[in-house]
């Protein structure tokens, strides 16, 4: 009976040691992401790209012939 108790304690200790050496679990990763301030998270989610198009700033689009195009931009503005 005493041997069973000792083996159980040994297994529990080894489990804790190996758990602390391992990679972070999914729950730990989510907790780290949730700990970011909401302003940082919001800023990364709402990244805007503004292009000056005839004096009017275009967001999320390209400037072609001084008119803003929101979709199907053939090239990325700023890259030759």
UniProtKB/Swiss-Prot annotation:
<feature type="signal peptide">
    <location>
        <begin position="1"/>
        <end position="21"/>
    </location>
</feature>
<dbReference type="GO" id="GO:0005576">
    <property type="term" value="C:extracellular region"/>
</dbReference>
<keyword id="KW-0800">Toxin</keyword>
<feature type="propeptide">
    <location>
        <begin position="22"/>
        <end position="42"/>
    </location>
</feature>
<keyword id="KW-0964">Secreted</keyword>
<protein>
    <recommendedName>
        <fullName>Teretoxin Tsu6.5</fullName>
    </recommendedName>
</protein>
<keyword id="KW-0165">Cleavage on pair of basic residues</keyword>
<comment type="similarity">
    <text>Belongs to the teretoxin M (TM) superfamily.</text>
</comment>
<dbReference type="GO" id="GO:0090729">
    <property type="term" value="F:toxin activity"/>
</dbReference>
<keyword id="KW-0732">Signal</keyword>
<keyword id="KW-1015">Disulfide bond</keyword>
């Amino acid at each position: 009976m005493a041997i069973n108790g000792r083996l159980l304690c040994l297994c529990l200790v080894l489990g804790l040691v190996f758990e602390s050496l391992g990679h972070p679990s999914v729950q730990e990763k989510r907790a780290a992401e949730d700990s970011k301030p909401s302003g940082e998270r919001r800023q990364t989610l709402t990244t805007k790209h503004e292009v000056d198009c005839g004096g009017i700033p275009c967001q999320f689009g390209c400037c072609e012939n001084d008119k803003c195009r929101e979709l199907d931009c053939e090239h990325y503005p700023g890259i030759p």
